[in-house]
Amino acid sequence: MKMSRSEHSLQALSWRKLYLSRAKLKASSRTSALLSGFAMVAMVEVQLDTNHDYPPGLLIAFSACTTVLVAVHLFALMVSTCILPNIEAVSNVHNLNSVKESPHERMHRHIELAWAFSTVIGTLLFLAGVVLLCWVKFLPIKPKGQKNGTVSAGVAAAITSTSIMVPFGLVFIVFAVHFYRSLVSHKTDRQFQELEELEDLQNELDHREEVSTLQSPGSLYP
């Protein structure tokens, strides 16, 4: 059975959505596994100086940031692990109609949530964790005999890392907002194109019904 141009376009659109969902899940799983692993290693390997009096807020912030970071990435990894095999199974079948068996349409919100957690929220938490780790690591470093009024080398190193990471974090936020707005605009344009394709398909189906009605024997001999 041959497909019309509109039907073929709808099939191509469905497959494009499937491949996009699969790519997002793969990117989320790789990014989440990598960043959560780094966060866990940083928390385990950091060596606190027991002779130094750390500010309680610094330790609480570092612990909370690392824990939330791991939890966010594990959630994204869990969603990717649960949904990705079902999409992979459908994408490996060489049948155009098999795209209807994929759960990517029903699980669209979960896929977008996992992608946002992994690439946006998780990355921001990772940047914040790097800054807090620098403060925890470098704050106790202080040469012997240094006066209390001067800035120690450890504090200077922590301030330097913070001053570098904060502008980079702002640039990342601006880029994320700009990318999201561009993506929404692109999706809006695609929605209009899909509506036009559906309208063309409906007109084509109506035309087929009219032709079949005119060619039927009952229409020629009442």
From Swiss-Prot:
InterPro entries: CRAC_channel, Orai_sf. Residues 1-30, 80-112, 176-222 are cytoplasmic. This is Calcium release-activated calcium channel protein 1. PANTHER family: CALCIUM RELEASE-ACTIVATED CALCIUM CHANNEL PROTEIN 1. Ca(2+) release-activated Ca(2+) (CRAC) channel subunit which mediates Ca(2+) influx following depletion of intracellular Ca(2+) stores. GO terms for biological process: adaptive immune response; positive regulation of calcium ion transport; sarcomere organization; store-operated calcium entry. The chain crosses the membrane at residues 31-48, 59-79, 113-133, 155-175.
